[in-house]
Amino acid sequence: MQGEKGMEVRYYICKHCGNIVEKVKDKGVPVICCGEPMQELKAGVTDAAVEKHVPVYTVEGSHVHAVVGETKHPMLEEHFIEWITLNTNQGIYRKQLNPGQEPVADFCLCDGEQVEEVYAYCNLHGLWKC
């Protein structure tokens, strides 16, 4: 999603405790957790099966249907998609997921709202987007 002056939303993770934050506006100040700067998450940089991690979405009218992977991602206790985020030209929507659920999310768009990006976060293989 583009924020002030075309800034892309960024995600950061703490290498100590695993906290993840979403930065929607960047004023150049580092994000700190556990006494150290957090590490920026980059989408799709982990060596993992692309066909199971990259989100795929369809839009029908005001309905957005997102699925993680052309081949659905496993949703096991030890390996699952934690969340799916839809970024639009007007806002950000997130669905939290748990093991055993399907790696899918449904969202509704408002008038004039357009999809910009869809992100998915795998507990083992990190951040992915389309």
What is the predicted function of each stretch?
Residues C14-C17, C33, C122:
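Short cysteine-rich clusters marking metal-coordination/redox-active sites
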Residues K23-G28, L41-G44, C130:
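Short Cys/His-rich "knuckle" micro-motifs
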Residues V21, P37-M38, G126:
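Cys/His-rich microdomains that often coordinate metals
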Residues N123-C130:
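Short acidic/polar inter-strand loop motif in beta-rich domains
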Residues K27-P37:
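Cysteine-rich micro-motifs
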Residues V67-V68, V104-D111:
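Exposed aromatic-hydrophobic patches
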Residues Y11, P30, Y119:
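Residues immediately within or flanking Cys/His clusters that coordinate Zn2+
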Residues V68-L76:
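Short amphipathic, basic-aromatic surface patches that mediate peripheral association
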